[in-house]
Design a protein with these regions (language model features):
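Hydrophobic packing positions in regular secondary-structure scaffolds
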Residues: 1-264
Length: 264
């Protein structure tokens, strides 16, 4: 309803874009930074795409200097290939600082698009834990599910009750956005899935094994990304678990994963 006081998303972006261009033109960096920091990463990505190369680099550099996390999240939304071209002008040690704050699958998406010598230098400069996580994903062949999965996937033991599962979920730091709750055995084999809604509706003493679905769609780490995208489209999934050759849960691909479902 045009009279309800809200503004359509595309109109908000148009207003933001006009303001960015105006503030850049008059050199009002402080005001420009304030405006950029109020934007959602996806909106910033659209703004980046509408600016000239020079203005885009200027806005990005300003944001990187003051709010690097927001800048990097916007670049992930912007697309790895375009974003890597913007980042390639920065020194490896600085890129390492920015990239190591991202989830490893996001970092891999950007590092994959950097020139080989620069990506190698970046990996050397990253913290051991961060570079190790990234290098583990880089070991998977390009165009495979393993290459784009997020290895930080929350899983529940099949021995839990619904109440215990809810407690585990509340106490986990790995959970960003839960679409499905995957259930594993003591050796981390993927054995089932349960929705959060289902978990909340049953009695707390109900065993997970009684309410989980054992017939679930998954991808192997070596599954081609196009096949993954087709599964997601065919079954209307928000996320898909990734397993290794022993059917152990290795990661997850969501519709938030960079370039994951671009083929759908």
């Amino acid at each position: 309803d045009p009279d309800d006081g809200t503004m359509p998303p595309h109109r908000r972006i148009d207003v933001g874009l006009d303001s960015v261009k105006r503030l850049q033109r008059i050199g009002a960096s402080a005001n420009l930074l304030n405006l950029l920091q109020k934007q959602h990463p996806a909106d910033l990505a659209e703004v980046f795409g509408e600016l000239s190369d020079k203005d885009c680099r200027g806005a990005l550099t300003l944001l990187l200097d003051h709010n690097s996390r927001l800048a990097m999240e916007a670049l992930i939304e912007y697309g790895a290939e375009h974003s890597a071209a913007l980042l390639a002008d920065h020194p490896a040690d600085q890129l390492a600082v920015w990239l190591q704050e991202l989830p490893s699958d996001d970092a891999v998406a950007l590092i994959d698009e950097l020139p080989d010598d620069l990506s190698a230098a970046v990996l050397e400069q990253m913290r051991p834990q961060a570079s190790g996580d990234v290098e583990n994903l880089l070991e998977y062949a390009e165009e495979t599910a393993g290459r784009i999965m997020n290895p930080m996937v929350f899983a529940l033991s099949e021995d839990l009750t619904a109440g215990e599962a809810i407690g585990a979920l509340q106490g986990s730091r790995e959970v960003e956005m839960v679409f499905y709750l995957y259930v594993v055995d003591e050796r981390r084999h993927l054995v089932g899935v349960v929705s959060l809604r289902r978990l909340l509706l049953v009695a707390t003493e109900t065993p997970l094994q009684r309410i989980m679905t054992t017939d679930l769609i998954s991808a192997r780490v070596d599954t081609d990304q196009e096949e993954v995208a087709q599964h997601v489209a065919s079954y209307n999934l928000l996320a898909i678990p990734v397993v290794d050759e022993e059917n152990k849960l290795a990661g997850i691909i969501t519709d938030q994963s960079p370039d994951a479902f671009a083929l759908t």
